[in-house]
């Protein structure tokens, strides 16, 4: 019996054997037969080799004797069975490689080919997403792409990625995955795991469309959105949904197709870990939501919850690069003038102290306001990226407010009340100041077209569409007007101070003191404008007249447009106290003690 291209051929068998047995080499493809491993002994009995003996019906046992080879390319196997004492002889002729394989020596003597991960150098498990990689890098790349995660590098974006240090910098690890040939589209084309959607209150829209924007990279104002229906996505609720993608990629594109966002090295120093803010906000939001719901069945043990909060605050503290200062000073202690004017109590009655600032309310350090966008930047900007960018701007704004000595002097309770009342105005001023960095016009244009398509599919009520469209129009109009005025960094800083120290918000205490700080901010802004723009007589009036427009914008819609995709139904107001408590001595101690 022969095969078309046999590696082993049976030349002859002894005809005296009535029911001859057969020697069979079993490969991975041969299954379904009962096999028995037996020992073959040569004629002298000095050596033994194992073979597989089987009969057509899988029954019977036998003894296999390995005889001396008659030629250099042949070996003899002599076997007997329990019901037949006459030995049968099978001569197997093969090449030397097959002989070694038959004797079980090939796998031992021949070195195995081992492939190594092109990303970290660990032992590879195969080719994944277009590159030979290990299970660790395969899983990391898959998670990063599927969850649209964004990372930041604390160094100069050239960290060493190897088996032992691959977890130290996620930014550089993802960057190397892309450089070594891993393809994002290979992950996105896989079948995604079944995800049970939680029921959430309806917000503004329920859509799974993806928005692709074809545009001149140098001109974000002429974007032309194109809608592509995502048939596989589950319906989501909210003005922005996870299936929505916006292409606002920057001109910095590598030859290998990797899209990166150029970051200012100095800004990266002060905002090195801001890429983790989305995770911090999510952790705090989920914890706050669990506490508010009182769901004991899903709550973790108390010590684990405390540990989660500790890690979240520690991450946030590192991200904002807080200094090793002591706890916020009391009114009587005074504040060092390095961050602005020194604070002194000039008079005190039985109720509240009166505070006066010696020197300027703001220093040159308060003028710097550099927002570092997440990177690497995806080709099609998704909701997670928009929310992450917005969270960076929000936290940067609050960090700026906390750095003002006069603000610190008001105390924690007053700080929380002020920020809760004006966070939307501070955030909007930040949007106007960073509109070019964020490509704000492109994002808003995409949202508008997304909402228009929602109207056609009856996903939103007419009243709700009108409210949201009016809000977006007001936001765009405000940003455009500030761009026309060409507001500089000093003017933006003083405008934010005027907004921050607004005494007319309901529920505030110590309004007279807050009003004093606001008046000082207005006077310093006036002095600056008169000295810097002396030829523009009405510049100050044109700037101040823009502030009332901030009060016309709904904080609820701002929250839904920029943050709902990140924190769900948890309000920004509930997160503000966590952020403002970071400067206590407890969390300053954690900054140096814990590692990210």
UniProtKB/Swiss-Prot annotation:
It comes from the Eukaryota. There is a cross-link at residue 192 (Glycyl lysine isopeptide (Lys-Gly) (interchain with G-Cter in SUMO2)). A zinc finger (NR C4-type) spans 117-137, 153-177. Residues 341-583 form the NR LBD domain. The modification N6-acetyllysine is found at residue 231. SMART domains: HOLI (SM00430), ZnF_C4 (SM00399). Disruption phenotype: Impaired spermatogenesis. Mutant animals have smaller cerebellums with disruption of lobes VI-VII. They exhibit a delay in monolayer maturation of dysmorphic calbindin 28K-positive Purkinje cells 7 days after birth. Deficiencies in acoustic startle response, prepulse startle inhibition, and social interactions were observed. Also responses to novel environmental situations are inhibited. NR2C1 and NR2C2 double knockout results in embryonic lethality around 7.5 dpc and increased apoptosis. Coiled coil: none annotated. Residues 114-189 bind DNA. Homodimer; can bind DNA as homodimer. Heterodimer; binds DNA as a heterodimer with NR2C1 required for chromatin remodeling and for binding to promoter regions such as globin DR1 repeats. Interacts with NR2C2AP; the interaction represses selective NR2C2-mediated transcriptional activity. Interacts with PCAF; the interaction preferentially occurs on the non-phosphorylated form and induces NR2C2-mediated transactivation activity and does not require the ligand-binding domain. Interacts (MAPK-mediated phosphorylated form) with NRIP1; the interaction promotes repression of NR2C2-mediated activity. The modification Phosphoserine is found at residues 19, 46, 55, 68, 98, 219. One of its GO terms (cellular component) is nucleus. PROSITE patterns: NR_LBD, NUCLEAR_REC_DBD_1, NUCLEAR_REC_DBD_2. Disulfide bonds: none annotated. This is Nuclear receptor subfamily 2 group C member 2. Belongs to the nuclear hormone receptor family. NR2 subfamily. Expressed, during embryogenesis, in perichondrium, developing glomeruli structures and tubules of kidney, as well as in intestiinal villi. Also expressed in lung and hair follicles. Orphan nuclear receptor that can act as a repressor or activator of transcription. An important repressor of nuclear receptor signaling pathways such as retinoic acid receptor, retinoid X, vitamin D3 receptor, thyroid hormone receptor and estrogen receptor pathways. May regulate gene expression during the late phase of spermatogenesis. Activates transcriptional activity of LHCG and is antagonist of PPARA-mediated transactivation. It holds the Pfam family zf-C4. The gene is Nr2c2. One of its GO terms (biological process) is cell differentiation. Phosphorylation on Ser-19 and Ser-68 is an important regulator of NR2C2-mediated transcriptional activity. Phosphorylation on these residues recruits the corepressor, NRIP1, leading to transcripional repression, whereas the non-phosphorylated form preferentially recruits the coactivator, PCAF. InterPro entries: NHR-like_dom_sf (IPR035500), NR2C1/2-like_DBD (IPR048245), NR2C1/2-like_LBD (IPR048246), Nucl_hrmn_rcpt_lig-bd (IPR000536), Nuclear_hormone_rcpt_NR2 (IPR050274), Nuclear_hrmn_rcpt (IPR001723), Znf_hrmn_rcpt (IPR001628), Znf_NHR/GATA (IPR013088). One of its GO terms (molecular function) is DNA-binding transcription factor activity. It is found in: Nucleus.
